[in-house]
Amino acid sequence: MKNEVKKVVLAYSGGLDTSIILKWLQDEYNCEVVTFTADIGQGEELEPARKKALSLGIKEENIFIKDLRDEFVKDYVFPMFRANAIYEGEYLLGTSIARPLIAKTQAQIALQTGADAVSHGATGKGNDQVRFELGYLAFSPDLKIIAPWREWDLNSREKLLAYAQKHGIDISKKKGKSPYSMDANLLHISYEGLVLEDPAHAPEEDMWRWSKSPKDAPNESEIIELDFQKGDLVAINGEKLSPAGLLTKLNELGCKHGIGRLDIVENRYVGMKSRGCYETPGGTILLKAHRALESITLDREAAHLKDELMPKYASLIYNGYWFSPERMMLQALIDESQIHANGRVKLELYKGNVMVIGRESANDSLFNAAYCTFEEDEVYNQKDAAGFIKLNALRFIIAGKNGRKF
């Protein structure tokens, strides 16, 4: 394949690993390299990535830096939260949901520039290789895919550093840079590696980059109100912001109050178990609020069906199948359920906790106090329950008369 590749688009962060990949592609494939850097809210200056690419011989016209923050939240994060998606009961899918957008945009740049290949920096052990490559192939089945970690012999940190030094790639460590393997976007930040590879070892407090420790969070709680339209967040405390602005604001609130830390061992799609630590402050608040709104606006059976389908939906995202027909089918069903998910939720934030203290919907609430009051009945006849119970118990009655024991 090496002689067949003339131009490749590399998902490029400007960091050491992808800079080594850039040089390796030039040397091993003798091809033209186009770099693509996505801004999905990782909180880093992206101009250094441009300068780094230029220093490694990339032409100015072959450097693409795109601000995808609003698209990421509007078209990926919000649809996922309409489903209340959680993987294995805990993980809010912060890394998983970012990969489809990066892959799609990278494939589009490949088509735009006439490239015949794409490349990524995901290892051969993880889920990201699957997520990226399923995304590439969904948009351009003819693209060749170069996954250096599955090809090269630079299989240790020492070999990588030696290669970088040999080719004049700066290997100086940024001041304050974490030693952990991290991935960040507007929804979360993740940590892997080092002491975290022992699931019995507690993470150090200074590992957490975003949020206050709940112990150090303010001693006074904070009450906020979130407004929703068709299942999507549209305002915080009455202030309407862009999708990215809303999630940024929620992150600030969550970090301030020590909300959204998570330490889990998850089952990777490739078959192994992996320990990861995550901070998802805004997403944790958003999920709590959305479920509270659905509690008054969704029909019982519709809500229960959503809950049954959610694990499948979450697994599809985790495993990289965002662009699959089955995910789109589920999304259509989920979006239909959100037509009446309109209203306001009041929350109290305090030392790592998100507590729902109110929910209302002017036109779409199915909560009717007249039916569930403990005071004198006016619209509900309690005697009706006797027949309801007897009909539901009929199979037990018949089985009992047949001599069956339970």
Swiss-Prot record:
Main subcellular location: cytoplasm
A Pfam family the protein falls into: Arginosuc_synth
Swiss-Prot/TrEMBL keywords: Amino-acid biosynthesis, Arginine biosynthesis, ATP-binding, Cytoplasm, Ligase, Nucleotide-binding
One GO MF term: argininosuccinate synthase activity
GO biological process: argininosuccinate metabolic process; L-arginine biosynthetic process; urea cycle
Family in the record: Belongs to the argininosuccinate synthase family. Type 1 subfamily.
HAMAP family: Arg_succ_synth_type1
Protein name: Argininosuccinate synthase
Organism: Campylobacter jejuni subsp. jejuni serotype O:2 (strain ATCC 700819 / NCTC 11168)
